[in-house]
């Protein structure tokens, strides 16, 4: 008899994010979206760090769905901007998810800053289970900001 997989709710309805979680964890877990778990919420990300925001989302979904949950938060930190846009990366221009405007504002704010304009992409993931301590991981990818967008087919700060 095949062992039943533990249900893991992803604190997102983003199809690309769900696909990635299913590709990585689908053999070990039954990965479901918030929508599939019957959770209809716009969770306020009011933490001051990526880790706090991931934990806020994961805890909300765990409590609403009475199941293990996983959430992530990520963004760009630019040294010359004191770490901005940071946790506000997706809404840096004032509107959530306007990638072109976020990139334009970032480049505007870096005008006159000489190379190398050091930056890093930060991603935090929180895994929570009822009656267990949370597991929180953080990863970074170092780089620098160029003078203009380059490439195609990307998203966010990778156009």
PLM features per residue range, with description:
Residues 2-9, 15-159:
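Anionic-ligand binding patches
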């Amino acid at each position: 008899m095949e062992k039943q997989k533990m249900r893991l709710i992803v604190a997102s309805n983003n199809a690309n994010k769900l696909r990635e979680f299913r590709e990585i964890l689908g053999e070990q877990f039954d990965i479901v979206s918030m929508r599939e778990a019957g959770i209809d919420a716009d969770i306020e990300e009011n933490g001051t760090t990526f880790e706090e925001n991931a934990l806020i989302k994961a805890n909300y979904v765990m409590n609403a769905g009475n199941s293990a949950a996983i959430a992530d938060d990520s963004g760009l930190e630019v040294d010359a901007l004191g770490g901005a846009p940071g946790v506000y990366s997706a809404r840096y221009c004032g509107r959530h998810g306007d990638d072109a405007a976020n990139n334009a504002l970032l480049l505007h704010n870096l005008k006159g800053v000489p190379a190398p304009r050091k930056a890093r992409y930060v991603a935090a993931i929180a895994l929570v289970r009822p009656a267990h301590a949370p597991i929180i991981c953080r990863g970074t990818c170092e780089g620098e900001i160029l003078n203009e967008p380059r490439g195609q087919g990307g998203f966010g700060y990778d156009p």
